[in-house]
Structure formats: structure tokens, C-alpha cells
């Protein structure tokens, strides 16, 4: 067992970079929040990925949150390389609110990021973006929480993905000292 697999399942995202004819979409699991104030997120991308070069060139990217309905597109985005894969995907690229990089209409949410830092760690570059705007489907979020009926995707390994169950677990009451 490879040690990194011990950290799965991880949420799956689509990273959009570039614009116009240079737009690309890739699947990524290695995405996380790195700061609340200012709100920043990070994504690890290998230098051989086409998206890596577009983020370096345009200094911005969009993190799109796919649902189970988008699994085919997630798979294409994660297994094909270069912009020609967009012809196979059934997504609609729409203008973002604050960036030149487009967002994905079918996504549960789109988080628009302006690149503020990048560092190489081993075989990946860690791109940190400050969130400058966002959009989301109203049916996918309620009361400031994800609506699990929207079927957010998580990647377990290889071709296996799961969604989150509707049952919410809460810890038993813990009394503070």
C-alpha cells in the first residue's frame, strides 16, 4: 500500500485554468483551504500537466465542485491530457465573476482564485490562490452547509468514487473543563 493512499478518500474537484483557446480542465484531489483571512486555497499539480503551465501563465484558476452527475467529465478531465479533452466533455464553460478564466456551469460551486504563491514540493507544485469570488447552485447548499442530496464526489482509488451519505454524525456531548 502506497502511504498516500492511506489519506483517501479525498474530495474531487475540477481545476479550470487559462481562457479562450488555451482553457483546460483537470481533475484534482489534492485541494485544501489554507487560510480564512484572507480566504486562500491550495492545489498540488505536477509540472507535466497542461493546467500547471496555464496557471503559471495566467496567474489564476477556478476550483469547480463536481457532483455525481459529472462523474464522466471528472474521469475524462483526470485521464486525458491537453485542451482537446474539452471536446469530449459535456460541460459548459461560462464567464466567471472576477476572472478571465471561465467557470463550469454544471458544477455545484465555482471558487475563483488569483494566484498569490507557488512552491515546488517534490514532484508537484503547490499553487495558493486567494479567493476573489465564488458562485454556487442554491440547491447544493443550505444554511451555510452542503446539501448532501447534491452528491458531492470523493475519490477513493483508481476508478472508484463515492458520495457522502445523508446521515449526519455528531459527537456525543463533551463537557469542557
Where are these regions (language model features)?
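Basic, polyanion-binding surface patches
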Residues: 1-177
Amino acid at each position: 500500500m502506497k502511504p498516500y493512499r492511506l489519506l483517501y478518500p479525498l474530495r474531487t474537484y475540477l481545476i479550470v485554468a487559462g481562457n479562450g483557446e488555451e482553457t483546460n480542465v483537470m481533475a484534482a484531489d489534492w485541494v485544501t483551504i489554507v487560510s480564512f483571512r484572507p480566504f486562500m486555497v491550495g492545489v498540488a499539480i505536477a509540472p507535466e500537466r497542461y493546467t500547471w503551465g496555464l496557471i503559471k501563465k495566467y496567474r489564476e484558476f477556478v476550483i469547480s465542485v463536481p457532483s455525481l452527475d459529472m462523474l464522466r467529465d471528472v474521469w475524462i478531465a483526470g485521464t486525458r491530457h491537453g485542451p482537446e479533452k474539452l471536446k469530449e466533455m459535456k460541460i459548459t464553460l461560462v464567464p466567471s465573476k472576477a476572472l478571465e478564466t471561465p467557470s463550469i456551469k454544471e458544477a455545484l460551486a465555482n471558487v475563483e482564485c488569483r494566484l498569490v504563491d507557488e512552491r515546488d514540493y517534490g514532484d508537484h507544485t503547490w499553487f495558493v490562490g486567494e479567493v476573489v469570488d465564488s458562485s454556487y447552485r442554491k440547491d447544493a447548499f443550505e444554511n451555510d452547509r452542503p446539501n448532501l442530496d447534491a452528491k458531492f464526489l470523493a475519490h477513493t482509488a483508481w476508478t472508484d468514487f463515492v458520495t457522502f451519505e445523508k446521515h449526519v454524525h455528531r459527537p456525543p456531548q463533551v463537557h469542557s473543563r
